[in-house]
Amino acid sequence: MDSITHLFLGGAIVAAIVPARHRRAALLAGAALNTLPDLDVFPLALCDDPIVRMTWHRGATHSWLVLPFVAWAIWAWFRGRGGRVAEAPTRWWWAILACLMAHPLIDAFTVYGTQLFWPLPMPPLMWSSLFIIDPLFTLPWLLACVVAWCARERILAQRALLAGITLGIAYVGWSLLAKSLVERAARPALVALGLRDAPSFSVPLPFNTLLWRVVAMTPDGFVEGERSLVADHGPMVFHAHASDTQALDAVSQLPAVVRVLWFNHHFAKAQVRDGTLVLSDLRMGSEPDYSFNFAVATRTGNRWQALRPPRQLPFVWKSRPGLDALWSRIWNQPPPTQ
C-alpha cells in the first residue's frame, strides 16, 4: 500500500495494544515502524538495473521469516533503554511485532507482489484485491488515529482505534468478496473463449473496489476485460491483444527475463520496438499503457543480445482524463458490444 496508509495503519495498531498512557507515543512509534519495511527502496535506488530494483523490493524487508527477529531487536533495544517499553514490555512486544507483520500482509493484498516468505524459492504473493492507493481503505485508519491523538487516554480513543481496525479489516473482506463476484462473472466468458484453464488474474482499477480488470493469457497474447459491479449486469466482454510470443521464447533464458517473469507470474506482454524487445507487466496498467516496461534485448540479425543493464521505459499517466474516465466507467458505461 501507499506510505500514507502505512503511517496510519501502524499508528492505529500500536496505539490499540499499548497502555493508554503511552497512546500518543504509540501513534508516532507505529507510524515509524510500519514505514520501516519500505526503506529498502533507498539501497535499491543505488542499483542501475530496474528489474533488480523492482523484483527485490518487498523482499527480505517484507518477509514474515525475517521480521520477527527485527521486531525482537527493536523491542530489546528500547526495553534496555528504559522508558515506556520497559514499563509495559509485553504489550510493547506484541505491538511492535503486530505492526511490522501487518505491513507486508496488507501489501500482499495488492497486485505488485510481496515475498512474504523470503528467502523460500516461491513467487511473490499477489492476492490483488486492493489497489495500492485506496482512499476508502485509508480513511478508517486515519480517522482512528486522529481521534486517538485528540482523546489521549480517554476510552473514546480506544473505541475509535478498535472501530478503525474493524472497519479496515471489513474493507479488506469486502474487496475479496468483490473480487470473487468479478471472477464469477468472468468465468463463463472465458470458458466460451476456450480459456477455462488459462492463467488469469483480476485486479481493481485505481482508487476503488467497484471497477475491475480481468486478464487471461492466450497462446498468442492475452484477453482483457473490465467489470463494474455497479453498471455491468450482462455477459462480460473481453478484447484480444497480441504479444510477440516468438520473440519472448527466444530470450526466455536471459537472466533478466527469467527474473521478471518469475516476479509477475508470467503475466507479461512482449513487443518489438525498433529492434528492441520490450516486456510490459500486464498486472499494472491496462492496454496499451503499463506502469512497468523494460527493454531487455536488442536484435542483431537473427539473434537477440541481452541489454545489460535492462532499461525501464518512462510511463506517463494522464491523471485528469484518466480519473474522469474511471469515474464515468464505474457508474455509467457498460462494456461496448462486440
Whereabouts are the PLM-identified features?
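Extracytosolic and intramembrane catalytic regions of membrane-associated proteins
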Residues: R196-P199, L211-Q338
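ATP/pyrophosphate-binding catalytic subdomain of soluble kinases
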Residues: P204-F207, L211
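N-terminal membrane-targeting hydrophobic helices
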Residues: M1-P204
